[in-house]
From Swiss-Prot:
Belongs to the ERG2 family. Depletion by RNAi inhibits growth and survival signaling cascades and induces cell death. The antagonist rimcazole produces the same effect. Sigma receptors are classified into two subtypes (Sigma-1 and Sigma-2) based on their different pharmacological profile. The gene is SIGMAR1. Residues 2-8 are annotated as: Targeting to endoplasmic reticulum-associated lipid droplets. This is Sigma non-opioid intracellular receptor 1. The chain crosses the membrane at residues 10-30. It is linked to Amyotrophic lateral sclerosis 16, juvenile: A neurodegenerative disorder affecting upper motor neurons in the brain and lower motor neurons in the brain stem and spinal cord, resulting in fatal paralysis. Sensory abnormalities are absent. The pathologic hallmarks of the disease include pallor of the corticospinal tract due to loss of motor neurons, presence of ubiquitin-positive inclusions within surviving motor neurons, and deposition of pathologic aggregates. The etiology of amyotrophic lateral sclerosis is likely to be multifactorial, involving both genetic and environmental factors.
Amino acid sequence: MQWAVGRRWAWAALLLAVAAVLTQVVWLWLGTQSFVFQREEIAQLARQYAGLDHELAFSRLIVELRRLHPGHVLPDEELQWVFVNAGGWMGAMCLLHASLSEYVLLFGTALGSRGHSGRYWAEISDTIISGTFHQWREGTTKSEVFYPGETVVHGPGEATAVEWGPNTWMVEYGRGVIPSTLAFALADTVFSTQDFLTLFYTLRSYARGLRLELTTYLFGQDP
């Protein structure tokens, strides 16, 4: 019995050590990356259009991002609004840019929703275009509410409760180990809604983003 208990503790210690080493490797890898976008850049651009009709704001934002970062934003024919079910909430996203270490997307809900934010190996920031964003941080007893023009930052490893009012739309930027966020983003789709067409759309959007980045890296930007 004591031998079995000791063996379990040894395995637990080994797993913790592996996790610690893996975490260090991940952060060292991120430290070597050159990023296309900056969090404040995305937030500042989004703030320019806060309060406008969200569709008008999004169209103007896309034009500006393409001007500033040619070869890094998906073309119109590959932009698609896709449902997202995760953490008990439901929204929709339109992916503009994706790589292994960062992404830019449009996100929101026409009806309102609430649930768990998830924990990520990534920093995620949302700048609100319209509506309201309520956030209840882990370890606190009060929630905060954010309005158009404000930016909500979700740090790596953090967890919060989130709630969006009806017709809340925002611009989201993520930086970190982006493939690790897909497990949370797709879990409800796989194990709850079983909407495998949405699963396909989500993975296809991410694959298109990766393909665009690879093409730009290999062949340069379009003139």
